[in-house]
């Protein structure tokens, strides 16, 4: 099929997915093959230009992803950078990840999708995506297409050379962005080592490196963040991976920000979600939002910008 015909078909898929209707197995296979062709050209430290809107964990909460797009602007009108964890825990992992991948294939320059610790064969077999694929398709093929694709997702992104974005955090094995560029990412997320750390680590109030309670990655203190940012000419590390009740949370004297974009996480945590808008001068503002109204609930959205210089 020629490019023009495929683009037309892709637009129909996006339209269908926007209504939370899954694609069929063959369509998913085609989509994942096209996505691999695009992602294989992307770097472990993918360069992104502002303006861009940075988002944290989504975790299969499809209707809340729709709310995110309502508040932040539709793709491709708004440039997006998602920091991983598209699947597991929510009820619509299939539709959520398929839509994000379809948008990536349709508008490769307008959306960047990074790998989270849940974009893994092992984790998805425990936390819901595998079972959901089985339930919705009757076999594990779609799960296999996506988990094979996950190996191609970039690990980190760099916005205008200054804001470093990734799912988890820093690694004792990594001092510079060049160390990250040199990693071989085309594999299942390892149990330990630098690639694992980037997807699993968390900032901590204690200085230095610590053992992570998660059983993978490390905790890292403000001294580590400051040293890393200074050595690499960065102004900020932006990451996701942790539930924060306001949707975003500064730490390490504003060297690190956590962004979490799944409101009322697991449909019971009661948290707000947030996204971070970076304008063309890299000034940031956070937009917070509540869960999408479910059917029968009054439609109220909360758009509350907080501006910081």
UniProtKB/Swiss-Prot annotation:
Subcellular location: Cytoplasm; Nucleus; Chromosome, Centromere; Cytoplasm, Cytoskeleton, Spindle pole
Active site: 118 (proton donor)
Cofactors, names only: Mn(2+)
Keyword Translocase recorded: no
GO MF assignments: metal ion binding; protein serine/threonine phosphatase activity; tau protein binding; transmembrane transporter binding
Phenotypic consequence of residue 118 to Q: Catalytically inactive. No effect on interaction with PPME1
Enzyme class, spelled out: hydrolase
PROSITE patterns xrefs: SER_THR_PHOSPHATASE
EC number(s) per entry: 3.1.3.16
Family label: Belongs to the PPP phosphatase family. PP-1 subfamily.
Subunit: PP2A consists of a common heterodimeric core enzyme (composed of a 36 kDa catalytic subunit (subunit C) and a 65 kDa constant regulatory subunit (PR65) (subunit A)) that associates with a variety of regulatory subunits. Proteins that associate with the core dimer include three families of regulatory subunits B (the R2/B/PR55/B55, R3/B''/PR72/PR130/PR59 and R5/B'/B56 families), the 48 kDa variable regulatory subunit, viral proteins, and cell signaling molecules. Binds PPME1. May indirectly interact with SGO1, most probably through regulatory B56 subunits. Interacts with CTTNBP2NL.
Protein name in the entry: Serine/threonine-protein phosphatase 2A catalytic subunit beta isoform
Native organism: Homo sapiens (Human)
Encoding gene (name): PPP2CB
